[in-house]
């Protein structure tokens, strides 16, 4: 049995939560964890699955009405649906990774009072990398399940989500002003409950940084796949790249040391 198969066996049944700001790479790390057999769970995925599989329930009807009106589904609807989704046989047997949920302390209190996690993986990225990375990286997303892609990490089939087959669209809200507001909201609403998770003793930090030896010339960006962060320097804007394969290997090494 090779190292990857051993890690898949170790990770079977594990319950993880990816914690980090917008643009930190949760989507790519979710893909890496799905490759280990974990089920990817986000609020949009759980809501659409509930509406599809149980359309006549009161929860489904309420969620569908709110979503069709363009509103935000309230916590008292979202959390029970996500918790129910986590009880599905595939999640119980294979384990799961929560991506981008919960977003608020209220959601976290409701969810984690019922769900025990093995690990909260905090993806810690410098804020300036986030702002320039998101704006400069031309991020894409699935219109159905919100799975993230970019020019440098595209779906296997152009325009089609690897996960659910939904349509891939450009994220029109990826501009500096909007990203700054989203990061402020993350700091105020989401990062604020990180100490509560740390008190449970299940948080591990995976710092994401860019070293000088990973700097590349902008002319090569179109031919290489990776996560691009634009950082203001005295010399102007430089393009720096985190190699996706390197980050995947780093994550797998971390999980092997943590659980093996």
Where are these regions (language model features)?
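Glycine-rich phosphate-binding loop of ATP-dependent small-molecule kinases
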Residues: 1-260
